[in-house]
Design a protein with these regions (language model features):
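Broad phosphate/nucleotide-binding scaffolds in NTP-utilizing and phosphate-metabolizing enzymes
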Residues: 1-13, 89
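Short coil/turn linker and secondary-structure boundary residues
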Residues: 10, 114, 126-129
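Conserved kinase catalytic-core helix
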Residues: 71, 80-87, 120-158
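Conserved ATP-binding subdomain of kinase catalytic cores across diverse folds
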Residues: 15-117, 143, 147
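Catalytic activation segment of kinase domains across protein kinase-like and atypical kinase folds
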Residues: 158-170
Length: 170
């Protein structure tokens, strides 16, 4: 099962190829304990594709019958954020592969952002340049999300990317 945003459907075969060859191709961006992220070139774009940890037996069943996969939720939440005018990497697609028991593999693809840093860098470095201003703007951003009905339940330092805009704002 998969879904590709209309804007990227002309590249369906390339995107499917990135997924099917994920283990053997792409540029490794993050290798975590649970998930891996690789970068793939698609014409002038760079796609960021996250491969989620293969679920255990119970979660295979849960993700088949009771709960959407992490890849699908990432795609749907990013799409909702975009619809609300909240900055997030442009969602491209999600893919789910099932076996006879349930969910086997899942992938989420989005446009890769350049010149960004993780909120973690600000939290860990009290001397980070413009730290106080970034924290004020981050607080304002979080409040605006809440006002738009978004309750970000996983606001961990690694889940938030920050970019400096041309006007000097973050």
């Amino acid at each position: 099962m998969y879904q590709i945003k209309e804007k990227y459907k002309a590249n369906k075969e390339s995107i499917e190829g990135f997924i099917s060859e994920f283990d053997n191709s792409g540029e490794l961006f993050v290798k975590g304990n649970r998930n891996s992220i690789k970068l793939f070139k698609l014409d002038a774009l760079t796609l960021n594709i996250k491969s989620f940890k293969k679920p255990n037996l119970i979660n295979k069943i849960v993700y088949r019958y009771f709960r959407k996969s992490k890849a699908r939720r990432s795609f749907e939440f990013a799409s909702k954020l975009m619809d609300l005018g909240i900055g997030t990497p442009q969602p491209v697609a999600f893919f789910e592969n099932y076996d006879f028991i349930g969910l086997n593999e899942s992938y989420y693809a989005c446009e890769h952002l350049e010149n960004v840093f993780e909120f973690r860098e600000i939290v860990q470095n009290t001397a980070f340049k413009n730290r106080d201003e970034i924290l004020r703007q981050f607080t304002r951003f979080s409040f605006e999300m809440h006002q738009k009905g978004i309750e970000f339940l996983d606001h961990s330092p690694g889940n938030t990317l920050i970019r400096k805009n041309n006007d000097g704002s973050y």
